């Protein structure tokens, strides 16, 4: 975070702004500071919630907070909490500024300076200074928004393997199946395609989100609005409100001591307070789980990283370890 040199107490201001950013990430709400309930945390950010302040070389400062204290207060205030488990999204961004000036965002562009104007395999004019500056501004705004919202973005390598499937025209033409094929190597939950049109009148971004069979589109004048849109969608699914409740989770296919590590899988989830073996019937392990949120949210998190697969043919929360291929299972819808 960059400190504001115009304020009298830069350190205190940085701590307050750090808490505001943290609350935006944790609650999943864009304007967290506008909620009266959250003023308690912002006003006391330098008190019992404060954990550390680091001022490394450069223009950035790092502020850390006590996660337990923050989460306890949010639970007491009945505010939403979005834990550490966050779906990764592949961002495929293509920009056309006219007159043959085209650019795509690639993985190497996370580190400045951005290599604008590189469109592998496509005849393209080098970007003018004006177009390069605009491309830089747009991409930085998108990456900054993703960081502020806590949305993990994966950028394509745009290497020979990617180019086997996807060309600039495929992204620009919204040929989703082609992009989806290329995205298989990246192991992501969603694909976010951004088509940026830059003209003398301004910038327009056409967004397409693919999540399984779902496809949604949005057109925005501001680059970050697509990121906020997707973050809001994820937050609605993954945030939990209130304290923990008891539920039962069945793990099918427990046949060795190695399989018992599924208990650690459950216990590691941010919404789970405890996961205790309740009974064993055959190779079915039933766990008594205290977790925030409802069963659907718990199921989404349990299958998010691919270690557990849901058994859809059974009612309730029934899963099997992904390393067990001899048990009927399928990915959740």
Task: Cite the ranges covered by each PLM segment.
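Pro/Ala/Gly-rich low-complexity, hydrophilic intrinsically disordered segments
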Residues: 60-95, 104-111, 213-248, 324-333
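C-terminal soluble interaction/assembly domains
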Residues: 211-213, 219-220, 225, 234-333
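Signal peptide-directed extracytoplasmic domains
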Residues: 31-120, 135-137, 148
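A short, hydrophobic beta-strand-centered structural micro-motif
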Residues: 44-55, 91-95, 154-157, 170-202, ...
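N-terminal segment of the mature soluble domain
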Residues: 15-34, 95-172, 262-286, 292, ...
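Amphipathic beta-strand/beta-sheet edge segments enriched in Tyr/Trp
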Residues: 3, 67-69, 182-227, 299, ...
């Amino acid at each position: 975070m960059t400190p504001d040199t115009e304020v009298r107490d830069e350190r205190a201001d940085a701590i307050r702004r750090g808490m505001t950013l943290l609350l935006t990430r944790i609650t999943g709400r864009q304007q967290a500071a506008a909620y009266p309930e959250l003023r308690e945390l912002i006003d006391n950010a330098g008190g019992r919630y404060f954990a550390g302040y680091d001022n490394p070389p450069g223009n950035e400062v790092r502020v850390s907070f006590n996660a337990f204290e923050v989460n306890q207060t949010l639970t007491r205030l009945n505010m939403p909490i979005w834990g550490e488990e966050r779906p990764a999204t592949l961002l495929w961004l293509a920009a056309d500024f006219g007159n043959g000036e085209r650019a795509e965002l690639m993985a190497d562009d996370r580190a400045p300076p951005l290599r604008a104007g590189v469109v592998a395999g496509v005849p393209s004019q080098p970007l003018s200074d004006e177009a390069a500056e605009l491309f830089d501004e747009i991409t930085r705004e998108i990456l900054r928004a993703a960081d502020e919202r806590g949305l993990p973005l994966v950028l394509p390598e745009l290497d020979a393997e990617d180019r086997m499937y996807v060309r600039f025209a495929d992204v620009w033409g919204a040929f989703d199946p082609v992009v989806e094929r290329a995205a298989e190597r990246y192991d992501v939950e969603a694909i976010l395609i951004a088509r940026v049109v830059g003209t003398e009148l301004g910038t327009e971004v056409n967004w397409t989100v693919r999540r399984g069979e779902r496809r949604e589109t949005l057109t925005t004048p501001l680059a970050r609005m697509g990121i906020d849109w997707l973050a809001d969608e994820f937050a609605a699914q993954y945030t939990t409100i209130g304290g923990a409740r008891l539920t039962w989770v069945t793990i099918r296919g427990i046949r060795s001591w190695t399989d018992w590590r599924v208990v650690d899988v459950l216990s590691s989830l941010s919404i789970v307070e405890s996961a205790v073996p309740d009974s064993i019937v055959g190779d079915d392990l039933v766990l008594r789980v205290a977790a925030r949120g409802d069963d659907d949210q718990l199921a989404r998190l349990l299958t998010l990283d691919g270690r557990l697969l849901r058994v859809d043919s059974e009612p309730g929360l029934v899963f099997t370890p992904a390393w067990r291929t001899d048990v009927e299972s399928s990915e959740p819808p």
